[in-house]
């Protein structure tokens, strides 16, 4: 069910920041974003519950928390401006909400890149039913 939901979001959210975030992930990790992170652990992908399974999953947990602080726009559909400069992601929007969304995505992509060595194929396509431990607070 989670796979179908993510596929639907991919098709519906073509104009949203999904592809912007995916591009950041590819640049920072060298991994294909959808295949590697769309259904990973308890937090990478749509929604999340339980305890993050590893450092990679924790990056996604923190990203979810960051999105929770965004006001005045939908972070999953907001389109922002950014660039890649000298190996870094630079968010360039003057709109505070869009800049915040970009900074959330930037921080998560950097985190995933810094923790690419913790990536565990056992958490790919991880069933949310395994995420039963009490969720941490943001």
From Swiss-Prot:
This is Acidic phospholipase A2 daboiatoxin A chain. It comes from Daboia siamensis. GO terms for molecular function: calcium ion binding; calcium-dependent phospholipase A2 activity; phospholipase A2 inhibitor activity; phospholipid binding; toxin activity. The lineage of its organism: Eukaryota, Metazoa, Chordata, Craniata, Vertebrata. It is an enzyme of class 3 (hydrolase). Gene3D superfamilies: Phospholipase A2 domain. The active site is at residues 63, 105. Expressed by the venom gland. One of its GO terms (cellular component) is extracellular region. Belongs to the phospholipase A2 family. Group II subfamily. D49 sub-subfamily. One of its GO terms (biological process) is arachidonate secretion. Coiled coil: none annotated. SMART domains: PA2c. Residues 1-16 form the signal peptide. Its EC number is 3.1.1.4. Heterodimer of A and B chain; non-covalently linked. The acidic protein (B chain) has phospholipase A2 activity and the A chain weakly inhibits the B chain enzymatic activity but potentiates its lethal potency. It catalyses: a 1,2-diacyl-sn-glycero-3-phosphocholine + H2O = a 1-acyl-sn-glycero-3-phosphocholine + a fatty acid + H(+). Disulfide bonds join 42-131, 44-60, 59-111, 65-138, 66-104, 73-97, 91-102.
